[in-house]
Amino acid sequence: MRILRTPDTCFDGLKDYPFEPNYTQITTDDGSALRIHHLDEGARDGDLVLCLHGQPVWSYLYRKMVPYLTQSGLRVIAPDLPGYGKSDKPAAREDYSYERQVEWMGQWLEENDFNNITVFGQDWGGLIGLRLVANHPDRFARVVISNTGLPYNPTTSEQLLKEIQQFRTDAPTPSLMAMQKAISGMPSGDPALKFAYWQKFCWESEQLPVGMMMQMMMERPSTPVMAVNFLMNQLGLFNYSPCRSDVAKAYDAPFPDASYKMGPRAMPSHVPTTSASA
């Protein structure tokens, strides 16, 4: 397995992220060494809260929660999933699967011997975290999940499944705007069809604009700011946009070039919405 490691300098000067890094080495099924990063903040004898992030973010997501939790006497552990943040990044699409993330994080959990855990899982962190609870029930005391779940409906018609599979196979890559429109409409209609826009956009966008997307979703910038960022991104110059925020910079930090983005590109396709999900 070819594994990439983001240089530490990429994370220099991140706003509101003063935390010391901690690293654990695990072994993949082909014998490769894989290093997983995590935050470990607060009193060592405090009740342990495990914060698991989703796609395409990393432990930076929890930067504002950590101080509140530690001030309450809790110990906070926030890892970066393999492929994200300061953790190592397997370089091939086939390196990523739901099962492998569960296996890797299970090894990480055992190596650190964490116990009496309250797990908070968001997005993929919920999917992976719930499997960790099932596989290691004696290590967990409480479960809190948010914004997570499989967009799979067993009553979806065969015709709709064929439409989704045909869309993913034959349709042109959706634009960022088309993808966002589809995702924002997920509460109505069939979520699997709309989620397919996210799956296809992520996989087929070699230069997946992680930072720009996070700035849009988390900060809701004004129309002029969005227009400038869209233009700069189209020109391949988003890193130089005068409207690029600290949040965008932080979520771009793990990915110095496109080769590091295989995790966030590949993982949405592993959500089982159709038989083509693999």
Residue ranges and their predicted role:
Residues G46-H53:
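Short beta-strand element of the alpha/beta-hydrolase
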Residues Q55-V66:
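The serine-hydrolase catalytic nucleophile loop
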Residues Y68-T70:
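Short hydrophobic signal-anchor/transmembrane segments that target glycosyltransferases
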Residues H53-P56, F255:
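Conserved residues at beta->alpha junctions
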Residues M1-P21, I36-E41, L48, L61, ...:
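Flexible "cap/lid" subdomain of the alpha/beta-hydrolase fold that forms the substrate-access gate
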Residues T28-L34:
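Short, solvent-exposed loop/turn segments that connect beta-strands within catalytic domains
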